[in-house]
């Protein structure tokens, strides 16, 4: 009986150690997105580390300029900032995070912005990125990864 108890304690200790070594969940990625399956819409990059109780930290950048210009906002629309909170489901391959930073509209000026981003892991044709500028409010269509990769681990 003592051997069985010692074995159970050892298995639990190894499981806990393995979880601790795995570290916190991370969502990261970069590439180009599309809303129609073929035309570039944005260039994006992010890295987010998720903690407990909604805590998260990292950075987010999304640029629509040049070949990825957002109609009505030429020549530039850029959202960049620091991630302040979020949630992740590693098993489902999804994450959501919020943050604050800057909305840059080129000649129309810069302003403080709050943003929300929802992502789904995957490469071209599979990965998803949906940016919503919360303040000033500005919805952006959901994008599918055209080139690049979104990873959640």
Residue ranges: model-predicted function:
Residues 17-22:
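Sec/Tat signal peptide C-region and signal peptidase I cleavage site
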Residues 7-16:
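Bacterial N-terminal signal peptides
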Residues 1-4:
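Positively charged n-region of N-terminal signal peptides that target proteins for export
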Residues 23-28:
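Cleaved targeting-peptide boundary
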Residues 81, 132-153:
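Edge beta-strand at a domain terminus
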């Amino acid at each position: 009986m003592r051997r069985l108890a010692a074995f159970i304690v050892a298995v639990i200790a190894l499981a806990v150690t393995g979880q601790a070594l795995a570290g916190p969940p991370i969502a990261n990625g970069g590439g180009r997105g599309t809303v129609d399956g073929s035309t570039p819409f944005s260039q994006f990059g992010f890295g987010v580390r998720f903690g407990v109780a909604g805590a998260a930290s990292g950075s987010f950048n999304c640029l629509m300029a040049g070949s990825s210009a957002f109609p009505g906002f030429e020549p530039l629309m850029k959202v960049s900032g620091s991630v302040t909170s979020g949630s992740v489901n590693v098993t489902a391959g999804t994450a959501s995070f919020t943050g604050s930073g800057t909305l840059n509209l080129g000649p129309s000026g810069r302003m403080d912005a709050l943003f929300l981003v929802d992502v789904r892991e995957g490469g071209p044709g599979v990965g998803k990125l949906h940016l919503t500028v919360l303040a000033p409010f500005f919805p952006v269509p959901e994008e599918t990864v055209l080139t690049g990769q979104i990873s959640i681990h």
